[in-house]
Amino acid sequence: MAYAFPPAWIPTLPIRGSSDEFPVRRIYCVGRNYAEHAVEMGHDPDKEPPFFFQKNPDNLAQTGEFPYPGATKDVHHEIELVAALSKGGTDIAPDAALDHVFGYAVGLDMTRRDLQAGVKKLGRPWEIAKAFEKSAPISEIVLASAIGHPSSGAISLAVNGKTRQSGDLSQMIWKTGEIIAHLSGLFELAPGDLIMTGTPAGVGAVARGDRLEGTVEGVGTLVVTVV
């Protein structure tokens, strides 16, 4: 068999302490999973549970640079804990969900906020705001076997040395296992899936030249420069 044209490259992430790479299949994202962030975005976390959307695997950015995208004048940072799956399935039981996690990483859900506001008013999907090129800078993956499954610990993001986002993983409305279990009732999960678990309050705009430093306690640090 021959391909009609060369197949697309397989997006991967490095694994700490290994020469192996983690092949990425899909990137799922959780919205409104920290109450204070839901409020700052104009939603009631007690009435509106988190929901899911996707980025494309080729949205990964691993160069340490985030190219400021076109068609926008208002790009925001959102720091997140990322869960990387090595096992999949459907209707996964909550008490077995964490057994599917290979490891964790630090990620940024970069967002064209002005475009998001526009499509929200029209009741349309968010892809143009969330799934543009290089919109998902993600760090190396650290094995769950090495650090366990983080359920608490500081999560923060600084821009040019000044803290903008600061929270704790314990503030997540839906915990990682609950996210996996619920998501598996909507989609068939598979090895290579990434789940971005939501962002704490303090999101804000970035500009060319900004240096972003995101940290999740016990997982690692991601440094990105906006170019």
Residues of each region from the PLM?
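Extended, compositionally biased flexible segments
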Residues: 1-101
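Catalytic-pocket segment enriched in acidic/His residues
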Residues: 2-21, 33, 37-46, 105, ...
